[in-house]
Regions:
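An N-terminal assembly and electron-transfer interface module characteristic of large anaerobic redox
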Residues: 1-197
């Protein structure tokens, strides 16, 4: 029988909504048929460290927190890892799960995708009601300032599904080449201080 053990690496309760995010990701992965062995960095005891090597795949949620650990575990134990953008929004969640499914095929992937599609249908109806009342959600400029992985995940969701943004600026270190296509501008720390003045 196929094994479907995974670890989530790079989670923390100190990030906004971190504990709830960890619970939601565990729920999504469990629904797809994965056994989440550890959530490294969030509610994990020292005794659980040995269990990290028992997974077939490590999923790095916030690369600035977990990428070094995932590389170390791969080197020491041979456990492969992936580090997709965190799943913000429905499209982001679908993309995130798709990358995991490609790396380690799930037992029940269709159930997880069906749940996202049902949530999208509910969201569509709710959003249309809001649009009828308030009009389209449009912004001339939006600035996202957050830890690197969260900033780029939020930027992707804002750009692709949450709102119509003419100019999107992200104040975070560049994550990868794909980030160039998400934001119109990347600001440095000095730029964000000037923008606050």
């Amino acid at each position: 029988p196929a094994r479907h053990g995974v670890n989530l690496i790079g989670m923390t309760a100190s990030y906004y909504n971190g504990e709830n995010d960890a619970r939601e990701l565990v729920r999504l992965l469990t629904g797809a048929g994965y056994a989440v062995r550890c959530v490294f960095g969030c509610d994990m005891s020292p005794e659980d460290i040995d269990a990290l090597a028992q997974a077939e795949l490590n999923i790095v949620v916030h690369d600035e927190l977990g990428l070094a650990a995932a590389k170390y575990i791969e080197q020491r134990c041979g456990t492969p890892y992936i580090a997709p953008l965190p799943p913000y929004g429905r499209a982001g969640t679908r993309r995130w799960l798709g990358e995991i499914f490609a790396a380690l095929p799930p037992a029940h992937g269709e159930a997880a995708m069906a749940e996202i599609e049902e949530a999208e249908r509910r969201d569509f109806l709710r959003i249309n009601d809001l649009k009828n009342t308030w009009g389209e959600l449009r912004f001339d400029t939006a600035l996202i300032r957050a830890p690197r992985s969260a900033a780029w995940g939020l930027a992707e969701a804002l750009r692709t599904e949450w709102a119509d943004v003419r100019h999107l600026a992200v104040a975070a270190q560049m994550r990868d080449a794909a980030a160039v296509q998400i934001a119109d501008e990347r600001l440095t720390e000095t730029d964000t201080v000037r923008a606050q003045e």
